[in-house]
């Protein structure tokens, strides 16, 4: 039977909500990315520093994960969108763990619901993966019922 892992980074809790929903629905292992540094949680610095770090392609040091990526056939990667990009924690993960020959589903969430550019950027960092789907969610914690409904497609992709 194919094994599935969900790897996610959450900043304000939206991606954490997505991870919790998927963990309750699917047979998968969940891994949260914890960076050594993050932008301020509020104020203008949140947007300036967070956006700058995403645009600049900054690396962050991640807390060690107990994941052997080669043990999984299916990967779900979930993250918030920062300045139209994926956050530094995702970039660091993709650099540290070479993602190759997997079935991959990518979930991005943002205030606008427009995460396509960030999703496409992830695709440039993986090799020979079969992209089985992607989702761009708008403020999942504020639109819980809508988000839950949209997550059905993730289950179907690996079901």
Residue spans of the language-model regions?
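Short, aromatic/basic amphipathic alpha-helical patches
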Residues: 117-127
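P-loop/Walker A phosphate-binding loop and immediately adjacent motor/lid segment at beta-alpha junctions
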Residues: 49, 102-103, 109
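Short beta-alpha junction loops
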Residues: 108-113, 139
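Short, conserved loop/helix-junction motifs that constitute active-site signature segments
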Residues: 69-70, 95-102, 125-127
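Short glycine-rich anion-binding loops that position phosphate/pyrophosphate groups of nucleotides
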Residues: 80-83, 111
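N-terminal beta1-alpha1-beta2 submodule of the flavodoxin-like/Rossmannoid cofactor-binding fold
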Residues: 1-77, 84-86, 91, 95, ...
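Glycine-rich phosphate/pyrophosphate-binding loop and the adjoining helix
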Residues: 130-159
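Structural beta-sheet core signal
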Residues: 6, 77, 105-108, 133
């Amino acid at each position: 039977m194919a094994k599935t892992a969900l790897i996610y980074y959450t900043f304000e809790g939206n991606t954490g909500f997505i991870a919790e929903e998927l963990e309750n629905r699917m047979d998968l292992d969940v891994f949260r990315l914890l960076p050594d540094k993050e932008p301020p949680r509020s104020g203008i610095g949140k947007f300036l520093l967070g956006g700058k770090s995403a645009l600049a392609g900054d690396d962050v040091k991640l807390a060690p994960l107990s994941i052997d990526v080669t043990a999984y056939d299916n990967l779900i990667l979930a993250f918030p969108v920062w300045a139209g990009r994926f956050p530094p924690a995702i970039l660091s993960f993709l650099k540290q763990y070479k993602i190759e020959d997997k079935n991959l589903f990518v979930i991005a969430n943002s205030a606008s619901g427009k995460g396509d550019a960030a999703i496409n950027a992830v695709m440039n960092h993986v090799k020979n993966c079969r992209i089985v789907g992607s989702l761009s969610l708008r403020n999942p914690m504020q639109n819980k019922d809508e988000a839950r409904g949209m997550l059905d497609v993730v289950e179907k992709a690996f079901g």
